[in-house]
Amino acid sequence: MTISNGDVKSETCNNGSSEKKPFRIFVGYDPREDLAYQVCHHSITKRSSIPVEITPIIQSDLRKKGLYWRERGQLESTEFSFSRFLTPHLSDYQGWAMFVDCDFLYLADIKELTDLIDDKYAIMCVQHDYTPKETTKMDGAVQTVYPRKNWSSMVLYNCGHPKNKTLSPEIVNTQTGAFLHRFQWLEDEEIGSIPFVWNFLEGHNRVVEKDPTTQPKAVHYTRGGPWFDAWKDCEFADLWLNEMEEYNKENKKEADNAK
C-alpha cells in the first residue's frame, strides 16, 4: 500500500508473471489496525502464484472521493463495517474481486481460492453458523450477534452479476446493516459456499487431527489478534507473530536499500 497526500495506490504483485490480469483484492483498513493490514497483505503476496492487486479500503479516502458519507454507528467495530460493500463499484462492476477483513492471515496460495469461483453465483463466501460467546472483542468493541455473522468478512464478488449493481454508493450509504451484512439483495441460491478453512474463525473452528480438510488456509482473528494486548495469547498467535517478524525484516531491508 502506498499512501500519499491522502490518496491510496493499490499494489500489484505478479511473482514474475505479467500476462494474466491481476486478481483484485480489497482489504478493509482501520488506522488502529495498520499492522494487521500490512501482515495480511504480506501473507497474501508471499504465497500467491498468480498476479494480485491489493487495495486497502480506507474510509477517509472514500469520503474525499464522495463515495462514502454515512455516519459511523455505535456498533461499528471497524471503519470498514459498511464500506466493504463498495467492492463491486470499486471494480467497475466487472469480473471477480475479493473483499477481506484486515484481521486475516493467509496460509495458502490465493490461487486455490480463485479456483473455486463459479460464475453462476453473485457472491461466494464461507457460510458460518457462528454465535460468539464473548460480549466484547478487539480493543473493547461490542461483540454483536446477528444472522449470517462473519459471512461478509471474506467475500468473493461476481462484480458483473446484474444483482450486484444494486450495491451503488447510494445503497451502501443508506441501507441497513441487516440488508447489507445478510446479503438481502440476493436470493439464497445466488450465494455460493466456500470451505470454512478459507475463513477459519480463531476460537470457534477446530482442526481435526489427521483430517487435512480442517487445516486453516486463512485464519480469521475475529475476536481480536495478537496486535491487541488483550489477545496476545490467542490461538494461532505464533503464526501471525512470525509473519509480522518476516514483514518487519523485509520492510527494514527495503528501507535500508532505499537510503
From Swiss-Prot:
Probable nucleotide-diphospho-sugar transferase required for pollen germination and tube growth. Residues 236-259 form a coiled coil. It is found in: Cytoplasm, Cytosol. One of its GO terms (cellular component) is cytosol. This is Protein CDI. Keywords: Coiled coil, Cytoplasm, Fertilization, Germination, Transferase. The keyword Signal does not apply. Its main location: cytoplasm.
